[in-house]
C-alpha cells in the first residue's frame, strides 16, 4: 500500500515497494486532500501521475466513502483512468450500494477495462451479487478461504451455497466491523492469535489493545463461523 500525505513521499514508498518485489501498488488517498480535494480533480490526477512515472507497477485506486472527504468523484476517477493507464483497478469502499453498482457497470465496461475489487466486507454477499471482478479485504487475513468460496458461489449464481457460506462469514463480519470501526484490524489480529497464525497482536498507539471481554467475543465469533472448536 502507498499511504502518504504528500506525492513525493508516495513516490518514495512506491519505489521502495517496487524494489522489494511488489506486484502491484494500492494507492491510498492522501489525507492532505480531505478538506475539499474533491473540488480539485487536478490534484488527484497529478498524484497518480507522479506515482505512475516512478514505477512500472500496476496501480489500484483506493476509493473511500464520500463522507470521509477522501472519496474521488465519479468523473475524477474516469479522468484518472484516461490519463494514467497504469491504473488497472479500484478497491471500492464507497459504502454506497447504488454508487458501487455504477462503478462496476461503468468501469468494467470501459474500452480499457478497469476492474472493481470490492472491500465492502461488512455486506460482502450483497456486493458480490453485483459481480465486481474480485475483492480486496483486510478480513481476508482471517477468512480468505470463506471469501473465495463466497465469491465463486456468486460468480456461478449458486445462491444456496452463497447463503450457506455467508452465514459463516456473518458472525465475524459483525464482530470485526462494529463500533468503534477503527478497532477492526486489532480484532483481526486477535483472531489470528486465537487461530495460532500470529504469536501476539501488536497494536500501534494511539490504538489500544482490546479488552479481554472483547477477545472472548471474537473467540465466540470464530466458533460460530466454524473456524475454531
Located regions from the model:
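Active-site beta->alpha loop and helix N-cap motifs at the rims of alpha/beta catalytic domains
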Residues: 1-71, 208
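Short, contiguous clusters of charged residues that form electrostatic/catalytic patches at enzyme active sites
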Residues: 12, 46, 75, 98, ...
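Short, electropositive alpha-helical surface patch
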Residues: 15-24, 76-87, 193-195
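Catalytic alpha/beta core domains of metabolic enzymes, predominantly
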Residues: 50, 54, 65-173, 180
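C-terminal alpha-helical cap/extension of soluble enzyme domains
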Residues: 139, 143-229
Amino acid at each position: 500500500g502507498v499511504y502518504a500525505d504528500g506525492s513525493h513521499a508516495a513516490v518514495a514508498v512506491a519505489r521502495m515497494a517496487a524494489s522489494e518485489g511488489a506486484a502491484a501498488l494500492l494507492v491510498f488517498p492522501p489525507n492532505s486532500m480531505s478538506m475539499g480535494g474533491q473540488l480539485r480533480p487536478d490534484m488527484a490526477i497529478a498524484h497518480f501521475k507522479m506515482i505512475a512515472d516512478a514505477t512500472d507497477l500496476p496501480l489500484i485506486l483506493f476509493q473511500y466513502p464520500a463522507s470521509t472527504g477522501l472519496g474521488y468523484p465519479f468523473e475524477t476517477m474516469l479522468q484518472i483512468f484516461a490519463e494514467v493507464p497504469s491504473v488497472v483497478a479500484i478497491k471500492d469502499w464507497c459504502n454506497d450500494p447504488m454508487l458501487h453498482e455504477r462503478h462496476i457497470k461503468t468501469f468494467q465496461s470501459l474500452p480499457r477495462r478497469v476492474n472493481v475489487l470490492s472491500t465492502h466486507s461488512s455486506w460482502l454477499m450483497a456486493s458480490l451479487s453485483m459481480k465486481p471482478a474480485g475483492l480486496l479485504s483486510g478480513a481476508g487475513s482471517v477468512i480468505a478461504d470463506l471469501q473465495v468460496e463466497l465469491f465463486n458461489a456468486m460468480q456461478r449464481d449458486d445462491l444456496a451455497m452463497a447463503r450457506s457460506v455467508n452465514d459463516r462469514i456473518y458472525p465475524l463480519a459483525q464482530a470485526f466491523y462494529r463500533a468503534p470501526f477503527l478497532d477492526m484490524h486489532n480484532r483481526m489480529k486477535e483472531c489470528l492469535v486465537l487461530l495460532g497464525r500470529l504469536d501476539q497482536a501488536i497494536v500501534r498507539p494511539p490504538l489500544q489493545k482490546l479488552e479481554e471481554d472483547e477477545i472472548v467475543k471474537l473467540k465466540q465469533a470464530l466458533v460460530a463461523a466454524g473456524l475454531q472448536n
